[in-house]
Amino acid sequence: IQIDDERTLVAHACRHPEAFAPLYLRYFERVHAYCYRRLGNPDEAADVSSIVFSRALSSLHTFRGESFRSWLFAIAHNALTDHYRARRTEQSLDDALECHDGQRSPEEEAIAHEARRTVTSLLAELPAEQRQVMELRLAGLTSKEIGLVLGKHANAIDQAQHRAMIRLRGLVTGAGSTTGDWR
């Protein structure tokens, strides 16, 4: 779907809610994967994803035409924040490498599970802003879209991602972060 097509679909869905289906079908898997990575629980991810699309449908009239994906992920970001507040527990991360297709051997599953645990623990070492940037990048958003979600300029997102990658590289090689402001 091109941006102009999305705008047309959004405008049509404002008048006819059943026309929201193509937008839902296009973005559900991405939003659900993002929620799952943030929550680590498939049931909670499904619940929050449902809330995201419910809010999106009821708030279509507020969409201003930039990028529907950015707008939708901003709703997802806010829904997750609300979920964490309601749950009052520390945010958990999961599964930055999710790609289970049912075709892997038990050994491959074990390796994939360990890789997910490693990525999760590495991401948990990042400052909150860098972690959010990396999670949204893993969800497939561009720097501009991440900026719209987090209320920052694309250049600031690129810098945060660069710093996160340097920090992750240091963590992987055992050097950790030795210089710089890692916010």
In which residue ranges do the predicted regions lie?
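Sigma70-family region 2
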Residues: 14, 40, 50-68, 86-88
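Arg/Lys-rich amphipathic alpha helix in sigma70-family domain 2
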Residues: 37, 62, 74-94, 112
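Short, Lys/Arg-enriched C-terminal cap helix and immediately downstream tail that follows
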Residues: 85, 126, 165-183
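DNA-recognition helix of helix-turn-helix
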Residues: 144, 150-175
